[in-house]
UniProtKB/Swiss-Prot annotation:
Probable S-adenosyl-L-methionine-dependent methyltransferase that acts as a component of the wybutosine biosynthesis pathway. Wybutosine is a hyper modified guanosine with a tricyclic base found at the 3'-position adjacent to the anticodon of eukaryotic phenylalanine tRNA. May methylate the carboxyl group of leucine residues to form alpha-leucine ester residues. Transmembrane segments: none annotated. S-adenosyl-L-methionine binds at residues 68, 122, 171-172, 198. GO terms for molecular function: tRNA methyltransferase activity. InterPro entries: Cupin_8, JmjC_dom, Kelch-typ_b-propeller, Ppm1/Ppm2/Tcmp, SAM-dependent_MTases_sf. It catalyses: 7-[(3S)-3-amino-3-carboxypropyl]wyosine(37) in tRNA(Phe) + S-adenosyl-L-methionine = 7-[(3S)-(3-amino-3-methoxycarbonyl)propyl]wyosine(37) in tRNA(Phe) + S-adenosyl-L-homocysteine; 7-[(3S)-(3-amino-3-methoxycarbonyl)propyl]wyosine(37) in tRNA(Phe) + S-adenosyl-L-methionine + CO2 = wybutosine(37) in tRNA(Phe) + S-adenosyl-L-homocysteine + 2 H(+). PROSITE patterns: JMJC. Pathway: tRNA modification; wybutosine-tRNA(Phe) biosynthesis. It is an enzyme of class 2 (transferase). This is tRNA wybutosine-synthesizing protein 4.
Length: 1021
């Protein structure tokens, strides 16, 4: 019976899949070329010949590929250099692609290679391309010797043969074809053969991959080196799900990973298929193993490029294994996961409620704090951190109690950063310490958030810049203890500091044992009643040390602040191994409920700790109790506590944010909100203790931006409210009167003007009829209950409404706002009332006294709003604002107030809530001018005068006319809104950027010294 011939459709599908798998080679080789160029500057480079253009990869990808390459290289080196008398050594690279293992091995190990033969096997099309590059590149063809065999037939599987290197074009599923080809030029059963499969057989269907593994075990004296993905916590773990989606999107799904998802299942896979000795490591174990690299080699990597993506690197390494199997028995116990931490013996059960995204922006590696409003509302504030594209200069504000009013925070504060800490100082303030921009730019500035006013004040700078440090409040005091952290790309702080709100930073003298210097550790302060005045105690654990390994020690600390120089004393935790699963973690967050401390997430030395674990710790004196907090078993429903924010409220924890870059496969963002009820845990751990909880109801409010102060010192300034000047009202007699107003550059309200019939006619019904009920308009819909719109935090959304629906909602005071755009070309041309709303145009006119406005008009804008506050901003062009219907309160500030109004560099809008701030000391250094506009009033707003508006009535209708009051100097190019800054300013910003970059190579303090001097020169010009 003849074998059925595959259908052409099936063959085409198979070929298409094969082509996609071959495509994965290109990305991998570009990454390996990046590693080769950066990390091996003193070696000959071979990947370069297979990559048309060098692309520097991100540090995370570089380090991950470096580890992959090192793992393979070590096993190949061991094979090559181990004596095997009477047997020729053969290295067969299965799915070799454009890999350069033969050339690297002969270059690195020279004579040790002896007569080792390297054979690359992959799809015929890919091997033919590789053959052409090898033959056409002298640096590669040199390995072939003088007379290599080169096949001439398309059907040949042996494409290239020489004494040291061969190429075979063969589908790895065709084992009989592969065997015949190899045996045609090589007595396999007389050889020592090492098969290498680096992320290749995982693309094969599992049956074919297993058949290949079993077949290989019978080839001579065989060894096998496998490197591929695993799913240690299942397919729903955030890293795993991102990885699987990535390969599925490429149509190159990982096949065997579901059947062999763990280290042990991979070991069993090989043991059942003829391999007598099997060693398996996940790549994090390989990173820690002296088999693959030593401490000095790990540390040296930091000198190549700054690196701080440790959580993401560990997650990557936990999801890959390197396996070394031999068909003969080697003796000894299999290497790999042998020294696991003791499993947790004590469990406590928590109740968790997960909520999908509440609309907050994506944020990770920020730091949380709990703030209060004057009305007593409680709020989780997730400060700064990393967003989708850059570090963020904003904070997410969540209410954590039902019916909370909005939290108003002053907008001046710390700059964008990650890896900082925020700590509640008890009855005092909230302290923000350090952080970084890039790993090469650590910050030493510190800030306090005043609980009474929710305003930031700059406080004492750290003695050294720090990020990835630990900070704890010393219970019952307004002091904070800072431990460890990094001061730069590779420098770890060995110092301990006390923050004193009056004396500043105090360096501690150290006694007792000397802890390893670490960063990313966690610290706990004990609240035991035995603490004496001025004496405090706690625990320090986890973090990464100078060798690039997670610290395997924990320490009890005691601090004495009663002496002039504080003293910190350390003692080792004696039963560490019993609790190492909870203590050997990096990047964990801590939160306290009563005397219990909860260590949340991070990644650990134990394989169980991959961002979804939680432990409950109790520290009292030199005793430590540890319990695993059971959150459930479904990884897809658990919070991903990597770069997340955790706070406590009563007996509950609230967790927001978090995420990780999953190597080269995309970024996972946890946008959920998690409430973890620990009331049962508290009752179990602290008998007789009951916590009376207020219900925790989490609601996202907004994400206000923070701007940096323009001068040094503590904020706010003078302790008095700003004096408000009433804007004068006048009547014009002639055109020249208005020209004088323009030249004087001061705001005025002009009364008694003939604006046409608009003031009498433009009620809701008339406007709807004139514009058209069904005409669609795009309006701002405020997302907060206060109606206070903020352009920077975008706390509004753009919605398309019929004009009738919009007017109805605005008339009843809903927080909607229409700023009309050009009807024909909204992205290209400025608004023009006559063209955009012809049904209304005849009712509105500018009187003769404002003839110069008509002559130099840039745009005329219809503005209609309900009860929505317009954000503080300035316009580059002068304008007249005519109130047609309703009433509005407007507050203006002169251009000289720019440094006091929280405008970020280059921004024309501020997040400062003027109408709230006027009742506080916050605007004491400003000069506010106020206008109440009624129908028929016209407000002249000079260029660069900052202004904001608040409705007095439910509905407001106005026409705003912008005009050029300068003869020249405006920016060229498209300017729909008329708010592009003057050309001289835009050019000046470019010049400043160039000047700033010219100081980049200088030490931070010298750089700041000279930049401040240049700033002084600008101010004195």
């Amino acid at each position: 019976m003849t074998k059925e011939k595959p259908s052409s459709t099936r063959v085409a599908k198979t070929q298409a899949l094969d082509d996609l798998i071959m495509g994965t080679n290109s990305s991998s080789i570009v990454s390996k070329r990046s590693v080769e160029r950066l990390y091996y500057p003193n070696e000959l480079h071979f990947f370069r010949y297979f990559v048309n253009k060098f692309q520097r990869r991100a540090p995370l990808i570089n380090r991950g590929y470096w580890l992959r390459l090192r793992a393979i290289d070590v096993i190949v080196r061991q094979f090559i250099t181990t004596p095997e008398p009477g047997r020729r050594k053969v290295v067969i690279n299965l799915g070799a692609g454009s890999d350069v293992l033969p050339w690297q091995s002969y270059h690195r190990y020279g004579d040790s290679c002896g007569d080792t033969l390297f054979i690359d096997v992959d799809y015929p099309d890919l091997m033919r391309k590789k053959r052409a590059i090898v033959l056409g590149t002298p640096q590669l063809s040199e390995l072939l010797g003088e007379d290599p065999y080169v096949s001439e037939k398309e059907t040949d599987h042996l494409l290239l043969r020489s004494d040291k290197y061969c190429q075979v074009g063969c589908d790895l599923r065709e084992l009989e074809t592969l065997r015949k080809c190899l045996e045609s030029f090589l007595p396999l059963f007389e050889c020592s053969v090492l098969f290498v499969a680096e992320v290749s057989v995982t693309y094969m269907d599992t049956i074919s991959a297993d058949a290949l593994i079993q077949w290989a075990s019978y080839i001579g004296q065989a060894e096998f080196c496998l490197l591929e993905q695993i799913l240690p916590h299942g397919p729903d773990h955030p890293f795993a799900s991102t990885m699987l989606k990535h390969f599925n999107k490429l149509n190159t799904s990982l096949k065997s990973v579901h059947q062999y998802p763990t280290v042990n299942s991979q070991r069993s896979r090989f043991e059942k298929r003829g391999w007598n000795s099997v060693d398996v490591w996940d790549l994090w174990e390989a990173w820690n193993s002296e088999v693959f690299l030593n401490s000095s080699e790990r540390a040296a990597l930091d000198d190549v490029e700054p690196f701080d993506e440790w959580e993401e690197f560990i997650l990557f390494a936990r999801h890959y294994i390197v396996l070394h199997a031999t068909s003969y028995h080697r003796g000894g116990k299999g290497a790999g996961q042998q020294m696991l931490a003791s499993p947790p013996g004590k469990h406590v059960k928590a109740n968790m409620v997960a909520t999908k995204s509440l609309g907050a922006p994506k944020r990770r590696f920020g730091s949380p704090l709990v703030a209060s409003s004057p009305e007593g509302g409680q709020y989780l504030v997730h400060t700064l951190g990393m967003g989708i594209n850059a570090r963020l200069d904003s904070c997410d504000i969540y209410s954590i109690q039902e019916s909370s009013t909005s939290l108003e925070m002053a907008p001046v504060g710390p700059s964008a950063r990650i890896c900082h800490t925020t700590t509640d100082l008890g009855q005092g303030d909230l302290l923000l310490v350090g952080g970084r921009a890039s790993p090469s730019k650590a910050f030493s500035d510190c800030w306090v958030l005043k609980k009474s006013s929710n305003s930031w004040e700059k406080t004492f700078d750290l003695p050294v810049p720090l990020f990835r440090h630990s900070t704890v409040n010393l219970p019952g005091s307004s002091l904070a203890l800072v431990l460890g952290g990094k001061t730069g790309p590779s420098e770890i702080s060995s110092d301990y500091f006390i923050f004193h709100p009056v004396r500043g930073w105090l360096k501690c003298a150290v006694s007792g044992v000397s802890p390893n210097s670490t960063f990313g550790a966690f610290a706990i302060a004990s609240t035991s009643l035995g603490s004496k005045n001025g004496h405090f105690e706690g625990l320090l654990a986890g973090g990464i040390d100078g060798e690039g390994k997670i610290n395997n020690q924990a320490y009890f600390w005691t601090v004495d602040v009663t002496t002039h120089e504080p003293i910190i004393h350390f003692e080792s935790v004696q039963n560490y191994d019993q609790h190492s699963w909870a203590l050997s973690v990096f990047g964990a967050q801590t939160a306290n409920i009563e005397s219990l401390s909860f260590v949340c997430g991070g990644v650990g030395q134990d394989p169980s700790s991959q961002g979804q674990s939680m432990a409950c710790l109790t520290v009292k004196g030199k005793s430590l109790a540890v319990h695993l907090v059971d959150l459930g078993e479904k990884a897809g429903q658990l919070p991903f506590m990597v770069g997340s924010a955790t706070v406590s409220s009563g007996s509950q924890l609230v967790i927001v944010g978090g995420g990780a870059t999953c190597f080269s496969m995309g970024t996972f963002w946890d946008t959920g909100v998690y409430k973890i009820d620990l009331e049962g845990v508290v009752s179990e751990m602290i008998p007789g203790r009951t916590i009376h909880n207020k219900p925790v109801v989490v609601g996202y409010q907004n994400s206000p931006k923070l701007t940096q102060p323009t001068t040094d010192g503590v904020y706010p300034g003078p302790q008095s409210n700003a004096f408000i000047t009433a804007i004068p009202k006048i009547k014009l007699q002639s055109k020249s009167d208005f020209e004088k107003l323009v030249q004087n550059r001061k705001p005025v309200i002009i009364e008694g003007l003939d604006l046409g019939g608009c003031v009498e006619k433009w009620n809701s019904e008339y406007v709807i009829q004139s514009v058209g009920e069904t005409k669609e308009v795009v309006v701002h819909e405020c997302q907060t209950s206060t109606g206070k719109m903020d352009f920077n935090s975008k706390n509004f959304r753009y919605v398309t409404e019929s004009f009738s629906s919009f007017m109805t909602k605005a008339a009843r005071g809903e927080a909607l706002y229409l700023r009309a755009l050009s009807e024909e070309k909204p992205t290209e041309a400025p608004a023009n009332l006559a063209e955009d709303f012809p049904g209304l145009a005849d009712d509105f006119r500018l009187p003769e006294e404002l003839g110069s406005v008509k002559d130099r008009m840039f745009s005329s804008v219809l503005r209609i709003s309900g009860r929505a506050n317009m954000w503080l901003h300035y316009d580059v062009m002068a304008n007249v604002y005519t109130q047609i219907q309703g009433s509005k309160r407007m507050v203006l500030f002169p251009p000289t107030d720019v440094s006091h109004l929280a405008f970020a560099p280059g921004a024309s809008s501020s997040s400062l809530d003027i109408f709230s701030a006027l009742d506080t000391h916050q605007l004491a250094s400003t000069n506010p001018h106020e206008a109440f506009l009624n129908p028929g009033d016209l407000l002249f707003i000079p260029a660069m005068w900052f202004h904001t508006a608040s409705p007095v009535t439910d509905l407001s209708v106005a026409v705003n006319v912008f005009f050029r009051d300068l003869e020249s100097g405006y920016s060229t190019g498209r300017d729909v809104y008329g708010n592009r800054d003057l050309a001289a300013y835009e050019k000046g910003r470019q010049d400043i950027s160039r000047i700033t970059k010219s100081f980049d190579r200088l030490p931070s303090e010298i750089r700041q010294f000279y930049l401040r001097r240049l700033a002084d020169e600008l101010l004195h010009e």
